[in-house]
Amino acid sequence: RAAAAAPQGRGAREAAQENTLPAFRLAREFGAEWVELDARRTADGVVVVHHDAQLADGRVLAELTVDELPEFIPSLAEALEECHGMGVNIEIKNLPSDPDYDADHLVSEAVAGLVQAYLGPERTIVSSFNIDTLDRLHAVDPTIPLAYLFAIGDPAMAIARACAHEMTAIHPYDPLVTASSVER
């Protein structure tokens, strides 16, 4: 059967800001079995949950320590603790075009450690548009399921790429999911 999912708490935007602890609490209260959240790394190496590379005031997360961030931005550890009992899709945000790009993919190592500490691989999938980031995570812990995100191109090519990199799934950008693409 299909699992109920609450991407980033978006189903209750008026009640809680997405990617926050209150949003994950609400997701549980609404009966979500899975949530999706976005992971980024700070200057001091802490993985935090935030969609954008920059804060509203323009400061880049990767140039700030966790203590310099607004209080509403949780660490990934705090978020995973809050999500206990639910499955979690952790999207690692790490594109070369992002101002917080982590060329060494250290975020992958940190995420792998947090998954093992808080949830385990059976209640987790880690996704990213950056295949190198996913490859690094797989090298650190091959038991964690991975999903390749893609926004353009032929889904068959994305499937082939995901298979070549030992990934569990593909996650296409919403507009790419049509009846005809699903049938293929």
Positions of predicted regions on the chain:
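Phosphate-group recognition and catalysis centered on beta-loop-alpha active-site segments
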Residues: R1-R184
